Amino acid sequence: MSKNYNKRQAETAAKTAAPAATQKKGKGSRKGLHIGGRTVYAVLGLLLLFFCVWEFSPVLRHLAEENYFSFEALPMAYVLREPLGHVLWIGRFLMLPFHWQWVGGLYLAALLVISGWLADKALACKAQWRGIGFVLPAMLLAWASWRGYNLFLRNEPSLLILWLWGLLIVSALAAGVKGLLRKKTAEETAEEPVRWYKAGGLWLSTIALLAVIGGTYAFRQNVILSCDMQNKMMDADWEGMVDDALAARQPDRSVAAYHAIALNHQGQLLEHVFDIDYNYPTVKLDSIGGMDEGVNYIAESNFHCGLVQSGYHYAMEQHVMGGPRLRFLKLMALASMVNDERELCERYLHFIEKMPFEGEFCENVRNLLGNAKAIADEPTFGRILQFLPREQKFEQNFRTPPFLGYNVGVLSGTDETLNTSVAAALYSKDMENIIMRSQYLQQKRTLPLCVQQALVIASFKRPGLLDNFKGISSYVQNEVVNFATIAAPLSKDKSEKGKEAMRQALVKDWKGTYMFYYYCGNLNQTAQKQTQTNVN
């Protein structure tokens, strides 16, 4: 009897111990195999932080320059007249943190993380779908990336921040209503870790965010780089601007223009202007006041090549057509300062200082205003003064855009203007102009390599031309002939496809030479056609 009793007791103990052992085993198996809510939100938050702070922050900083905000109604009259004008006014106020690049990135990331977390709460999905709410911030970022230049060029710059705050408010309201209507149980509020391969919400949101990060890098590199170059231009970081241009896989006109501005300030324009590839991509812009990409760079290019009045005029046109933008107000103030128009400059400074955080800019301008020596001694403005026109002619006398048309057509100027005029002729592939200006240039300095290469190309149809130029080495002549020999069989196909095939075959070994630019560069004229009155 005792044996049967002991047997039954052992069986009971075994049955009791089995679930405990299973439970213990289950708890132990969660280590490294299960993902909790904190891990989900940490991973997605880091991805958003990476995009907002590291990748997209230059665009946010430039958005601050495309913005204008004042607490007073009169300076904001243009905005207030628009439909939902007061909403746009609030949106422009909410953009103010973008004034600091890293603060703006953190601000954007915080809004997106909170929105995603609140959307998750509103959806109240099962544990394996935790994090699915972050698909909404990913979709908003995908829209911002897809818009590209249209996010701010001739469009209301506050749309992005308004959409962000709208998403946050809607998510908060939805989460609040969900919390009121449904009482949380202990099971729902528990951590509820799930196996990593079952974390569908995390996987979907991660894939969506990685797609946005990768797509922005692949298709919107020029937007980010041009914004970064404009930001660096405000700090006179010419070397940083050049580095940005060299990093571009296929620079657009904006990147090329700011690259030239930086090289000009470094005094290296003719030495390095053809270091980048001038195979311009087609930029798709909204047809708002025109589809010309030039609105992004013409005013600054005119100003920094010494055409101060032309830069002022272009900025004023955009100011009138598109409403107040800090970027154009600052340029008009600087142009007025350089032209010693003190009252006009003070007028623009009056508007600028109504915007928060712009006191330092106004103070710096006022310290120079009316002091010709101080302006000449300041590196950036002193350099601009060296390029001021010596000919008294109207803008209409030259092809557009002025910073190219003037330098192609100018007949007299300073030694510095001679450099820019040669560069403009090289860019325009105007051989007669190149030959004429190079004759003057060789009297001032040793001919740069790109000029020597251009003259050798010109000599193919002008025997004896090189006799007029000293210092063109046999090495340069042989190099150009070598290029022509390699390119000749590739140039037989005159179709667009054939030209692109030729460019691809030569770009690796010959990019950076004038031969490559002359035969393979700046051929895509779909976005900005070259005519008798325009320079592409």
Q: Predicted segments — roles?
A:
Residues 48-53, 136-148, 208-214:
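Aromatic-anchored segments of alpha-helical transmembrane domains
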Residues 53-94, 98, 102-103:
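Membrane-interface coil-to-helix junctions
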Residues 55-64, 143-156:
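Juxtamembrane "helix-exit" motif on the non-cytosolic side of transmembrane helices
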Residues 28-44, 127-129:
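N-terminal membrane topogenic signal
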Residues 109-127, 141-145, 171-175:
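Transmembrane-helix motifs of polytopic, lipid-linked glycan transferases
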Residues 220-388, 392, 409-430:
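Soluble catalytic regions of membrane-associated enzymes that act on cell-envelope
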Residues 37-41, 77, 101-110, 157-171, ...:
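Alpha-helical transmembrane segments of polytopic membrane proteins
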Residues 195-220:
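Internal/C-terminal transmembrane anchor helices
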